[in-house]
From Swiss-Prot:
Pfam family, one: Ribosomal_S19
Nucleotide-binding among keywords: no
Keywords attached to this entry: Ribonucleoprotein, Ribosomal protein, RNA-binding, rRNA-binding
Species assigned in the record: Pseudomonas fluorescens (strain Pf0-1)
One MF term in the entry's GO annotations: rRNA binding
Function of the protein: Protein S19 forms a complex with S13 that binds strongly to the 16S ribosomal RNA.
The encoding gene: rpsS
UniProt protein name: Small ribosomal subunit protein uS19
Length: 91
């Protein structure tokens, strides 16, 4: 269920400050964050944000199509390796 337009997008303040500083300095280093719940804003386009997936930080290069989505959508937390093959079918 999307957030109400009356409330506006949610973004953690500490992440917003880091983004403003990086944009001001034209810094190309990834911004490390644990805030998967923050929404991607137009100010983030072109920046690389390292989003934590529970084990490591996954670098996410933000483009215009990602605006409006959450950061956590682009850093998967589960590792699916497929089902084990049935040994009876091989015989």
């Amino acid at each position: 269920m999307p957030r109400s337009l009356k409330k506006g997008p949610f973004i953690d303040l500490h992440l917003l400050k880091k983004i403003e500083v990086a944009a001001e300095k034209n810094d190309r280093k990834p911004i490390k964050t644990w805030s998967r719940r923050s929404m991607i804003l137009p100010q983030m386009v072109g920046l690389t944000i390292a989003v934590h997936n529970g084990r490591q930080h996954v670098p996410v290069l933000v483009n215009e199509d990602m605006v409006g989505h959450k950061l956590g959508e682009f850093a998967g937390t589960r590792n699916y390796r497929g089902h084990v093959a049935d040994k009876k079918a091989k015989r």
